[in-house]
């Protein structure tokens, strides 16, 4: 998918275009809508591997009765509170209205508000991040929850905006929750994995290298992100990459983090993960 979830794929896409891989041939298709485009492609077999939101992976697994597995986490939390004025902590939001995109940003923020014992009204009037960016930049809302790179886009439109709370840092303060706010992942069709285990292993190796490249070569990576249609603005991508929490987490660490995160989401809205927390067969552990 486009946006942060796809950022880590940029170098792999460039290498594939340059013929760097001798045993695998990759074809990439950047999509914007998980439910309407990516999920059907996984179900129909039009896509073998996809970078998607972690709750989307759970939905795909439950909907297909195990025909999709998660390979690795690729994005930790990239949500922030932005607004007209700076705040020091969740306590400063008590009694206020905060605007948030629908689905995961709302669920995550609601959970953190509960954990911090603050009473906040969450408004989903601007359900799409792009619409909320416009409203924030225009001064129509006092506080909003937005992901990177949308935070950087908003700041580019209105330099007076204040970014106050890093929701990943706030999440990590909770007991036993360190590095479990996992918002993006890479999945594979189970049938493809079973038929081509070596190809999947090779992909993961190349993908991990790509993620590392993006994190250490932000200027070059930003250009590749634009070149391959993952995001439209290279200057924004360059500024946003260090704050996007792009990672490669596989194996038991991936399983533990995703299980914790999906269990929390299930407690807020089971429908957000496809009805139930996936069982152990959901996870590819490379064994």
Please identify what each model-predicted range represents:
Residues 193-268:
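Secondary-structure end/capping motifs
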Residues 1-37, 43, 60-63, 110-114:
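Short, polar/charged alpha-helical segment
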Residues 25-34, 49-52, 119-128:
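Short beta-strand-to-loop elements that line the ligand-binding cleft
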Residues 55-56, 128-224:
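Pocket-lining segment of extracytoplasmic ligand-binding domains
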Residues 1-17, 84, 88-153:
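Bilobed "Venus flytrap"/periplasmic-binding protein-like clamshell domains
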Residues 70-89, 181-194:
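Hydrophobic/proline-rich hinge and linker segments of small-molecule sensing/allosteric domains
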Residues 259-287:
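Conserved C-terminal helix/tail region of periplasmic/extracytoplasmic solute-binding proteins
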Residues 66-73, 96-99, 173-182:
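A structural signal for short loop-to-beta-strand junctions that line the ligand-binding cleft
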């Amino acid at each position: 998918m486009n946006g942060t979830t796809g950022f880590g794929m940029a170098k792999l896409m460039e290498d594939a275009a340059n013929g760097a891989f001798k045993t695998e041939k990759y074809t990439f298709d950047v999509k914007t809508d998980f439910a309407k485009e990516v999920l059907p492609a996984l179900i129909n077999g039009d896509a073998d591997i996809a970078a998607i939101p972690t709750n989307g992976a759970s939905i795909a697994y439950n909907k297909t009765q195990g025909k999709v597995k998660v390979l690795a986490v690729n994005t930790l939390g990239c949500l922030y509170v932005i607004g007209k004025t700076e705040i020091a902590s969740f306590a400063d939001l008590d009694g206020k209205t905060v605007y948030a995109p629908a689905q995961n940003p709302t669920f995550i923020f609601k959970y953190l508000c509960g954990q911090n014992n603050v009473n906040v009204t969450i408004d989903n009037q601007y359900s799409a991040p792009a619409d909320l960016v416009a409203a924030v930049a225009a001064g129509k809302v006092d506080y909003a929850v937005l992901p990177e790179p949308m935070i950087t886009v908003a700041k580019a439109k209105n330099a007076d905006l204040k970014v106050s709370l890093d929701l990943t840092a706030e999440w990590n303060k909770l007991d036993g929750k360190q590095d479990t706010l996992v918002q993006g992942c890479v999945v594979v069709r189970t049938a493809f994995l079973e038929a081509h285990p070596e190809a999947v292993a090779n992909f993961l190796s190349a993908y991990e290298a790509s993620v590392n490249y993006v994190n250490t070569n932000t200027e070059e990576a930003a250009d590749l992100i634009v070149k391959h249609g993952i995001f439209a603005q290279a200057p924004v991508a360059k500024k946003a990459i260090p704050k996007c929490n792009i990672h490669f987490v596989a194996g038991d660490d991936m399983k533990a983090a995703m299980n914790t995160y999906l269990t929390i989401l299930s407690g807020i809205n089971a429908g957000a993960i496809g009805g139930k927390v996936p069982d152990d067969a959901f996870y590819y552990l490379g064994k």
